[in-house]
Amino acid sequence: MQRPADPVRVPSAPVALSSASVYPESAASAFEYASRLGYDAVEVMVGIDPVSRDFEAIRHLSEYHAIPVCAIHAPCLLITQRVWGTEPWGKLKRSAEMARSLGAKTIVVHPPFRWQRDYARAFVPGIADLEAESGIAFAVENMYPWRASRRELQAYVPSWDPVGQDYANVTIDLSHSSVSHSDPIQMVEALGPRLRHVHMTVLNDSAKDELLFLLF
């Protein structure tokens, strides 16, 4: 019987609960669960939940439950296209304001959709400019090709894979790497110190992007 690989230990890395993991419950539930289950922090997914967009409400939840906010996930999903307006750079600047007000050091952002042409054209240098202006890490997340029947659709520009792009900070999502059939270990090794943030999940050989509630 093959001996299991030794676990990778990162003592200084906090383990956070994403508010997306408790959907359709609200961000308030994420803070409650994080406190009860012993998480170190919360990642706030800014979305259709009004609480997730309210700086003061999130600050109150963080203080009440004594759980810090470690990251803000910018509203860049299909279902959040109108959250904080429709201008992509405005959304990211608003995310930086929220992160700064809550003491979060990381903003998770997806690469642009192909139809966001002007945004996509300036995305790589624009992210670097935002980091320089704000002092906050904008960690671009790995995505995956969209599949329709037997065809693959490249929905993200410049790429769904951030490893080969000139980003200073990257988020690796293990659910996304599973859907794209990417080797996350190779991605981590290729990124080196550019790896800023990791989205954990329980992989179950599904072709769907799934964030599961993790109990540690």
Specify the residue positions occupied by each region the protein language model found.
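Catalytic domains of carbohydrate-active enzymes, especially glycoside hydrolases
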Residues: 28-49, 101-103
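Active-site acidic/histidine proton-transfer and metal-coordination neighborhood
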Residues: 3, 7, 11, 28, ...
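Short amphipathic alpha-helices and their capping/turn segments at secondary-structure boundaries
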Residues: 52-66, 96-97, 125-128, 181-193
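Acidic/histidine-rich catalytic cores of soluble enzymes
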Residues: 41-42, 130-216
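A cross-family glycoside hydrolase active-site/sugar-binding cleft signature
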Residues: 16-20, 43-45, 70-75, 107-110, ...
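Acidic-and-aromatic substrate-binding clefts and catalytic sites of carbohydrate-active enzymes
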Residues: 20-27, 44-57, 77-88, 113-120, ...
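Short acidic/polar active-site loop segments enriched in Thr and Asp
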Residues: 40, 68, 104-105, 196
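Boundary/entry segment of secreted carbohydrate-active catalytic domains
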Residues: 2-26, 76
